[in-house]
Amino acid sequence: MGSIGAASTEFCFDMFKELKVHHVNENIIYSPLSIISILSMVFLGARENTKTQMEKVIHFDKITGFGESLESQCGTSVSVHASLKDILSEITKPSDNYSLSLASKLYAEETYPVLPEYLQCIKELYKGSLETVSFQTAADQARELINSWVETQTNGVIKNFLQPGSVDPQTEMVLVDAIYFKGTWEKAFKDEDTQEVPFRITEQESKPVQMMYQAGSFKVATVAAEKMKILELPYASGELSMFVLLPDDISGLEQLETTISIEKLSEWTSSNMMEDRKMKVYLPHMKIEEKYNLTSVLVALGMTDLFSPSANLSGISTAQTLKMSEAIHGAYVEIYEAGSEMATSTGVLVEAASVSEEFRVDHPFLFLIKHNPSNSILFFGRCIFP
């Protein structure tokens, strides 16, 4: 398999299988890449069985040369962490083309001594950090401190990240991971073309949405065998693209969810499937925000020791008993008209008249936002209603 992109994609689908069981007929949005990166920070300090389980769940065990290269003082092969750091630095560097804010941090109970070399390693490899707080004597103040940090990091978008009661005096360590994204399209949708139309949630139920429109040349794949089609919408940077996987039928989502896999997705989005076609594209405004307690998901995937008294985090702390108490992930994605270049009105008028094919996103679909250079899935989602 051999790469971070493949490992994060495989983890992405494992996670989706778990989430869809617990979130039937609900929107889903999460960032596999951001979850893998913060789990990798924990992984640096995990030892023995805890480490082996983590390696399997995040598919690091399949990365070529993973165990061999450079056993550094950070206790694991540096190559994986270096390539993750490169991808994350690339994606999170300030850009005019999109806003992406990431708030990822570990918070540990201050009575646990944290090894200075661990702090050094996560700083070098991830620009990451672990902060000690007093859960034992001031759990609610710790929660408020965490929430205000997440809010600041995401420019006020993600508020009240940890709910009251989510930490208590018994809390030992919390993994916090929140990510916000709003991109600028390579080709903008024009505000005046947006209209209110019904979005058909089921055969019986529909709700009004703001539907954007543009006509132009887009990469599209028709997957007749699966009764669905795929549209790629590039963001202005050229490095990120959104892929919309749209079933032909209103009720076709379940079949698509059952079929999708890492192999299928790479086949469907390969260059011999995706072709440039003139297309009228209708895409709804979207504002999807979800939050998950990842503890149950990760345990179900096989990462059991980390959250139990059997945890071995001796690379983080000399305390024998340290375990992860909670892992919380939140993702927020907004989809609007804004683009870097406006389509010229005359060109569009001519083109629209000559275009007969439509890609009309007016019923439930899957979508993903991909970092093309590393082939990594930054966001994966299911939209039941935008």
Swiss-Prot record:
Gene Ontology cellular-component terms listed: extracellular space
Positions where Phosphoserine occurs in the chain: S69, S345
Marked site (Reactive bond homolog) residue numbers: A353, S354
Modified residues (N-acetylglycine): G2
Location in the cell: Secreted
Keywords associated with the record: Acetylation, Disulfide bond, Glycoprotein, Phosphoprotein, Secreted
UniProt cross-references to Gene3D superfamilies, sorted A to Z: Alpha-1-antitrypsin, domain 1 (2.30.39.10), Antithrombin, subunit I, domain 2 (3.30.497.10)
Disulfide topology: C74-C121
More about this protein: Much lower abundance than corresponding protein in chicken egg white.
PANTHER family, per database record: SERINE PROTEASE INHIBITOR, SERPIN, SERPIN B4
Function of the molecule: Storage protein of egg white. Lacks protease inhibitory activity.
UniProt name for this protein: Ovalbumin
Taxonomic source organism: Dromaius novaehollandiae (Emu)
Gene name of the encoded protein: SERPINB14
